């Protein structure tokens, strides 16, 4: 496993150089949807990451936001070792010069995350995890918060890029109900960094429904779990990497948080 995480870190840092180089420059922007953006940096980073990983692990499978999945509109997650990559999570932040952007690289074996690497090159924060061996921020062990009162919890969520009225109404309605039960709410614009925020205790809770795909959570979910947290479906059922639904919490807040989310449905 050490070889896997070392190679993933190398790839993330190389992609991070591209992101850092382009962060303060003008960008060529394309639209995947009305507000769903992609830049030449997203594409260049994914090519770099996949080339680096394929050189080291040619027999592995690969799923990426910008090429593998976006080109066909679907993907297949098998039991084979599979690298799941978001080359630039937080593209809208990148376009606006808002420094919550990251490279997210996860490895699954038998459909379970076993390696997670999330790197924010703008503030030089590297989150890593190997299954069963803990989670780390820049090499130092991290743990989820010990907060036990929902009313004191800081929660993160996102509104996503889907502008279908029914989905937007459901999202905002959920926020309107949850906000009265917690201390405050944040939206960073990056699913992967929200998960890492829970892992290191900056955030107590995170949930998101209808995010882009497994590339948003493959690395971050493992990092939360290895930091002592729980990753679930917002309904309280088992987390499904491919379902585009996630909730992250510590053990103390789990029941109250899941109840609050279910009451909001």
UniProtKB/Swiss-Prot annotation:
Q: Which Gene3D superfamilies match?
A: 3.40.190.80, Fructose-1,6-Bisphosphatase, subunit A, domain 1 (3.30.540.10)
The record, for PROSITE patterns, names: IMP_1, IMP_2
Q: What is its EC number?
A: 3.1.3.25
Does the entry feature the keyword Metal-binding, yes or no?
Answer: yes
Q: In which tissues is it expressed?
A: Low expression in roots, stems, leaves, flowers and young and mature green fruits. Expressed in the stem/leaf junctions, below the shoot apex and on the abaxial side of the petiole of the first expanded leaflets.
* Pathway(s) served: Polyol metabolism; myo-inositol biosynthesis; myo-inositol from D-glucose 6-phosphate: step 2/2
List the Gene Ontology MF annotations in alphabetical order: inositol monophosphate 1-phosphatase activity; inositol monophosphate phosphatase activity; magnesium ion binding
Keywords annotated in UniProt? Hydrolase, Lithium, Magnesium, Metal-binding
One GO BP annotation here? Answer: inositol biosynthetic process
Kindly list the cofactors needed.
Mg(2+)
What is this protein's expression induced by?
Down-regulated by Li(+) and inositol.
Q: Where does substrate bind?
A: 65, 88-91, 189-191, 208, 216
Keyword flag Hydrolase: yes
* Enzymatic reactions: a myo-inositol phosphate + H2O = myo-inositol + phosphate
Positions bound to Mg(2+) 1: 65, 86, 88
Q: Where, in this chain's numbering, is Mg(2+) 2 bound?
A: 86, 89, 216
InterPro entries of this UniProt entry? IMPase, Inositol_monoP_metal-BS, Inositol_monoPase_Li-sen, Inositol_monophosphatase-like, Inositol_monophosphatase_CS
Q: What does the sequence similarity comment in the record state about its family?
A: Belongs to the inositol monophosphatase superfamily.
Record's function text: Responsible for the provision of inositol required for synthesis of phosphatidylinositol and polyphosphoinositides.
Under what name is this protein listed?
A: Inositol monophosphatase 2
Where does this protein come from, organism-wise?
Solanum lycopersicum (Tomato)
């Amino acid at each position: 496993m050490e070889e896997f995480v070392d190679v993933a870190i190398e790839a993330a840092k190389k992609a991070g150089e591209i992101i850092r180089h382009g962060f303060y420059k003008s960008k060529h922007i394309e639209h995947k949807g009305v507000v769903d953006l992609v830049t030449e940096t997203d594409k260049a980073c994914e090519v770099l990451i996949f080339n680096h990983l394929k050189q080291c692990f040619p027999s592995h499978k690969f799923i990426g936001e910008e090429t593998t999945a976006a080109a066909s509109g679907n993907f297949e997650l098998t039991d084979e070792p599979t690298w799941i990559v978001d080359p630039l999570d937080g593209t809208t932040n990148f376009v606006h010069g808002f420094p919550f952007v990251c490279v997210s690289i996860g490895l699954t074996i038998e459909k379970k995350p076993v390696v997670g690497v999330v790197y924010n090159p703008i503030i030089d924060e590297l989150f890593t995890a190997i299954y069963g061996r803990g989670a780390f921020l820049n090499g130092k062990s991290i743990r989820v918060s010990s907060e036990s009162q929902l009313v004191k919890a800081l929660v993160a969520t996102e509104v996503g890029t889907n502008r279908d009225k029914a989905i937007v109404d459901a999202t905002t309605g959920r926020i309107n109900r949850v906000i009265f039960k917690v201390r405050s709410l944040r939206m960073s614009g990056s699913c992967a960094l929200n998960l890492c925020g829970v892992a290191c205790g900056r955030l107590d809770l995170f949930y998101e429904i209808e995010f882009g795909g497994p590339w948003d959570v493959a690395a971050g979910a493992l990092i939360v779990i290895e930091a002592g947290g729980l990753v679930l479906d917002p309904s309280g059922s088992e987390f499904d990497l491919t379902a585009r639904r996630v909730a992250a919490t510590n053990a103390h807040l789990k029941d109250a948080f899941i109840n609050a989310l279910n009451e909001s449905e």
